[in-house]
């Protein structure tokens, strides 16, 4: 069993804002020109659409309007917790497995929040699991979560 990726940051904003930025403003901070299906195909994505509710979909909108399903929201507890099944593959490759991404938001005061992102279920990828975890997502979350998301929260 492969250990999950766990990333912990503190952001200088309220718990409510930290949650809303992560879920409802995702396409304002996610690096659309680097960490998207479209970017793997050579062009930045236009947008990310999040249907913010349990069972809602997270969808990338490509430059030509093509939609790529990133995952489905499994748990949705506004301001506290958000989880989704998650994976996207290069253009033309079938997505046959998904990880579980869980994000927990804990208030540390009026203007400070701890945000913990955990990505698990690597076993679903079989032989590719360690490579995806260590060289793919493990490195990407540094730029996406610790960099872009934290900056969007004012950090």
Residue ranges and their predicted role:
Residues 16, 80, 147:
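Glycine-centered loop/turn positions within well-structured domains
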Residues 1-44:
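Hydrophobic ligand-binding cavity/cleft-lining segments
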Residues 34, 107, 116, 145-152:
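Short, contiguous alpha-helical
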Residues 18-22, 58, 73, 84, ...:
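Hydrophobic pocket/interface hotspot
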Residues 39-46, 150-155:
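Short, highly charged C-terminal tails/helix-capping segments
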Residues 120-155:
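A conserved amphipathic terminal alpha-helix motif
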Residues 6, 45, 101, 132-136:
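Alpha-helical scaffold segments that form or flank carboxylate-/histidine-based iron centers
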Residues 49, 54, 59-112, 120:
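Hydrophobic-ligand binding "helix-grip"
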């Amino acid at each position: 069993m492969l250990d999950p990726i766990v990333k912990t940051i503190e952001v200088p904003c309220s718990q409510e804002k930290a949650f809303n930025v992560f879920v409802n403003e995702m396409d304002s901070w996610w690096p659309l020109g680097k960490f998207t299906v479209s970017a793997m195909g050579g062009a930045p994505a236009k947008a990310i659409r999040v249907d913010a509710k349990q069972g809602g979909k997270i969808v990338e909108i490509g430059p030509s309007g093509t939609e790529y399903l990133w995952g489905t929201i499994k748990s949705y507890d506004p301001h506290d917790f958000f989880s989704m099944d998650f994976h996207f593959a290069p253009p033309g490759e079938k997505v046959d497995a998904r990880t579980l991404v869980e994000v927990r938001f804990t208030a540390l005061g009026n203007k400070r929040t701890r945000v913990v992102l955990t990505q698990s279920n690597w076993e679903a990828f079989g032989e590719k699991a360690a490579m995806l975890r260590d060289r793919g997502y493990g490195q990407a979350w540094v730029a996406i979560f610790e960099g872009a998301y934290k900056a969007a929260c004012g950090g």
